[in-house]
Amino acid sequence: MVCLARRILVGAVFGCAVIALHSHAQNRAVDIYETKESLSLQVRDMYQREITGKVVVTSYKPTGNCPFPILILNHGRSGTDRPQPARFRYTQQACFFVKRGFAVFVPTRIGYGEFSTSPDPEDSGNCNQKNHAAMAEVASSQVIAVLAFARQQSYVDARRVVVVGQSVGGYTAIATAAKNPDGLVAAINFAGGSGGNPQTRPGVPCQAYKLEKMYADFGTTSKVPTLWIYTENDQYFAPSYSQAWHQAFVKSGGLAEFNLLPAFAADGHMLFTAGASLWEPIVTRFLEANGFS
């Protein structure tokens, strides 16, 4: 991937709502600074087509003394409505991480949001002919490029990096960890996977055995601790699949703490966006165990 250009679009300061946490010191409102920029990048899809598009990066940083560790927060995927939302912000989730002292970068990848493209660079093929590897490469290569951009910011500590993601973004986080970018300390996977469809195949992802192999491959090269969070009633990836993926990852040498939470609402796949009070304590413990207090 080649970074071609960068453009500053907006800047704003807003306050995070108070979110109850275990530590009294963290139970406070915090002002954070938000910016929106675009990177022009080139990727190669599963058909070997070169696609140039824009990655919109929404970034948040705390007030106070820097440098701040970097956190890249990766979104999931809608195969039918990729232009929505216009950009991913994850404001509530970003506030949680900013309160813990992170500079947070949320990329809206090529093919999504206001700059959604055709062809779709993350197209992984039909359900019976999935190429999960190509999707992982396209998405993770963009994360690496965003990380390079983040490292250029004067307020970051490039030696301390965490990659986080939900759904396809969680899959992308583990794929990125397998590349061992400089400074990476840990990765967090919320309901990570690909090929799920709760309407046509509830809980049963397309060609899950290929995903199991992908996670095994990731485990052979990944060196940092990872945290995996799934739920009993995930309508995209049932527990039998997420547990098999975790086992494949660990058996191949990956370091992973697996958490299977009870059923959440109608679809546990939405835990990251709607169930913060359930996952925040788990993530807090993991971050503290890896030097982010």
Task: Show the residue positions of the predicted features.
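Alpha/beta-hydrolase
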Residues: 74, 107-109, 189-190, 261
